[in-house]
From Swiss-Prot:
It is an enzyme of class 5 (isomerase). It is found in: Periplasm. Keywords: Amino-acid biosynthesis, Aromatic amino acid biosynthesis, Isomerase, Periplasm, Phenylalanine biosynthesis, Signal. The keyword Cytoplasm does not apply. The keyword Signal applies. Pathway: Metabolic intermediate biosynthesis; prephenate biosynthesis; prephenate from chorismate: step 1/1. GO terms for molecular function: chorismate mutase activity; protein homodimerization activity. Catalyzes the Claisen rearrangement of chorismate to prephenate. The joint presence of this enzyme together with cyclohexadienyl dehydratase and aromatic aminotransferase in the periplasmic compartment comprises a complete three-step chorismate to phenylalanine pathway and accounts for the so called hidden overflow pathway to phenylalanine in P.aeruginosa, in which two possible routes for it exists, namely either via phenylpyruvate or L-arogenate. GO terms for biological process: chorismate metabolic process; L-phenylalanine biosynthetic process; salicylic acid biosynthetic process. It catalyses: chorismate = prephenate. NCBIfam families: CM_mono2, PRK09269.1. Its EC number is 5.4.99.5. This is Monofunctional chorismate mutase.
């Protein structure tokens, strides 16, 4: 069977667009921010296990607000606005809860010994500080005309690098989905 003119035309169109679709330059600060966000999301599995063991609720509004206020208070020393920081970390928290709720909606395997939530929170605090440090450089990379394609490419790359499953890939997208908007604030 010979290819039709239409199939050759489609192939040519894809080949011509391919380089344009791949032309987004690598954004190292953005990629680092997404890597940190991904690491933060992967801790949600342990948090969910801890909450399953303890019976604690996923929603912890007082702690969330405390964290948001503390991080927003550090915004100026990291070259970003307090509102930008609140938006970033509110999205991080929501993405983390998305993972927790999904994992808790099905029986979790027995972890054996109790999960140390304080150790996990300590790691989350460390990642939060690293996210805060990397936020201004990432926003600077996103203040371009092609922000959305650049962000999408970086998200796809992070999903591949970290071999994220569908749940964590969706959560990462949720955690970073509004970065282009936040860069303009």
């Amino acid at each position: 069977m010979r290819p039709s003119f239409a199939s050759w035309g489609l192939l040519a169109l894809l080949l011509l667009q391919g380089p344009l679709l791949q032309a987004q330059p690598l954004s190292p600060a953005l990629q680092q921010l997404l890597s940190l966000s991904s690491q933060r999301l992967q801790l949600a599995d342990q948090v969910a296990q801890s909450k399953a063991q303890s019976g604690k609720a996923v929603q912890d509004s007082p702690r969330e607000e405390q964290q948001l206020q503390m991080l927003a208070g550090q915004a100026g020393s990291h070259g970003v606005g307090a509102e930008q920081v609140r938006l970033l970390f509110a999205a991080q928290i929501e993405a983390n809860k998305l993972v927790q709720y999904r994992l808790l909606s099905r029986p979790l395997p027995d972890a054996g010994q109790a999960v140390d939530l304080e150790r996990i929170r300590s790691r989350l605090n460390q990642l939060n500080l690293e996210l805060l440090r990397g936020y201004a450089p990432a926003l600077a990379e996103l203040r371009v005309d092609d922000c959305r394609p650049r962000l999408n490419q970086a998200l796809q790359r992070q999903v591949r690098v970290d071999r994220l499953d569908e749940l964590h890939a969706i959560a990462l997208s949720r955690a970073a989905g509004d970065l282009c908007h936040w860069a303009e604030l």
